[in-house]
């Protein structure tokens, strides 16, 4: 995959997300290598937990932690690693880990991909149980890894998500 050919935004309202980890997959953390285009196994998670959403990043962005902007894509199905999915941001999970701030944009597929998410405009439109599962996952997925920790500090709205995305794009430009 030639990541340099994939834009961060499909248009003013949609982002492109490269999936690294499918929802409900085994306890394996994958990472996309930008230079080779390969997906590497980053580590086998010591907890037997699976990601509650598809997990990936926005190409050509840089977040505060030095990595591309992270995105959780809410969907009804797992998406194959390496796939590019067009999404709309609806909010952000604010958290910190042993390395510092580590925000996660929450997004849904565009209407062209799945009309069942058309009514989701903000985080408040998502099911409360899904939001609880997301928090639970991130609060505990590193529990058995020595020296690692996560603290979820709250949720922010779509405006904050859009701001973080634009800041991430600006850091690369």
From Swiss-Prot:
Function, as annotated, reads: Catalyzes the hydrolysis of inorganic pyrophosphate (PPi) forming two phosphate ions.
Reactions catalysed, as given in the entry: diphosphate + H2O = 2 phosphate + H(+)
Instruction: List ligand-binding residues for Mg(2+) 2.
Output: 70
Fill in the subunit field for this protein: Homohexamer.
- Where does the chain bind Mg(2+) 1? 65, 70, 102
> What GO CC annotations are associated with the protein?
cytoplasm
As recorded in UniProt, its EC number(s) are 3.6.1.1
> Which GO terms fall under biological process for this protein?
phosphate-containing compound metabolic process
Name of protein? Inorganic pyrophosphatase
């Amino acid at each position: 995959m030639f990541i340099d050919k994939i834009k961060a935004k499909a248009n003013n309202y949609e982002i492109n997300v490269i999936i690294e980890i499918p929802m409900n997959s085994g306890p394996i953390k994958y990472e996309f290598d930008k230079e080779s285009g390969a997906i590497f196994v980053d580590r086998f998670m010591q907890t037997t937990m699976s990601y509650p959403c598809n997990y990936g990043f926005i190409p050509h962005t840089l977040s505060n932690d030095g990595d591309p902007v992270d995105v959780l894509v809410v969907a009804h199905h797992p998406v194959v690693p390496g796939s590019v999915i067009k999404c709309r941001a609806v909010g952000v999970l604010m958290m910190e880990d042993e390395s510092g701030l580590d925000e996660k944009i929450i997004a849904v597929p565009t209407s062209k991909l799945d009309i069942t998410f058309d009514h989701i405009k903000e985080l408040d439109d998502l099911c409360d149980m899904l939001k609880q599962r997301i928090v639970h996952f991130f609060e505990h997925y590193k529990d058995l890894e020595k020296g690692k920790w996560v603290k979820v500090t709250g949720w922010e709205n779509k405006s904050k998500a859009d701001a973080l995305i634009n800041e991430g794009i600006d850091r690369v430009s």
